[in-house]
Amino acid sequence: TFTEYGDSSAPSHFGPVRNPWNTERVPGGSSGGSAAAVAAGLCYAALGSDTGGSIRQPAAYCSIVGLKPTYGLVSTRGVVPLSWSLDHIGPMCRTVADAALALQPIAGHDPLDTNSVAATPPDYAASLRQSVSAVRLGIPRAVFYEALDPEIERTISDALRVLQKLTASTRDVELPRYNNLPVVGAEAYTFHAPYFTKTPERYQSMTRRRLEAGSRVTAAAYIEGRRELDRLRHAVVSAFSTVDLLVTPTTPILPTTVTQALNDPGTPPPGGVALSLRNTQPFDIYGLPCISVPCGFSRSGLPIGLSISGPHLGEREVLALAHAYEQ
């Protein structure tokens, strides 16, 4: 089942997507159908789109691997956009090796995509064999490690101990902070305006409300948001002056119930959508490669994910450490 225009995975035309690990829970979104299909063994791999966490959140919630590549590494040509400035396309698989293989044929420059990066992809599968013993890990504790579900906090602490044995060092780092950027709403409305203004009744209620909100973003606010986005993508480079990779919990909370997701109060509830994307959205903003790998389960059997992020075009290093941890 598919969600409407990358909005979420609960309100779908064919009914809500359900988590294979607990069918009363959501699989995450918006690529929840892709994640659920991979987790249930219905396919070897699936593609997801990620604007605020829509590959990695479902990967964490469904105990699979989800890779959001560097912005522009995989062409978005032909994809219905949510936000031209933030959309990423990447693979969702059961193992890191599968993710490396799935990334290979879709990565690379597309001259017909204005956001495509002019880069020649390396052999991603070969990167799984490279040593990670010299890797310096960065831990951005501010924001990313705050207000975690106690079971996620416990599981991530265990994962960090494993990573410390695999790598050279760990140290705390600071990442650039930002306020809410109105870029997504404005760009989503711009794409949908020709259809939305003529037949708004064809859109689901949640999508309709969010598009209406995007229509109210002023030109000045959008321009300032784009300027801030460019600043953040330049500023985050300095975070890798003393570390090679970053490690964060993929989500600060466990998957909510389908019933809660369908209630749709119109604005994110406490602990709801905004919080569930708190740890994933920054890496869309920064445009950095980020992979979520399974790292355990809650006592009630709900999956928990660990994220590893790298510098611009650092997919090889991200995959290498993710694979080493997985083993």
Residue ranges of each PLM-predicted region?
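Short glycine/serine-rich loop/turn segments
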Residues: 1-89, 142, 248-269
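Charged, often glycine-rich, active-site loop that binds/positions anionic groups
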Residues: 10-15, 180-195
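Short, flexible loop segments at the rims of nucleotide/cofactor-binding pockets, characterized by
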Residues: 13, 23-25, 114-117, 222-228, ...
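Structural helix-boundary/capping segments
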Residues: 40-146, 157-166, 217, 223-227, ...
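A short beta-alpha structural unit
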Residues: 141, 145, 175-187, 210-214, ...
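Short, surface-exposed alpha-helical segments at coil->helix boundaries
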Residues: 153-157, 186-189
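Serine-dependent amide/ester hydrolase catalytic core
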Residues: 167, 192-285
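General small-molecule cofactor/ligand-binding pocket signal
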Residues: 169-174
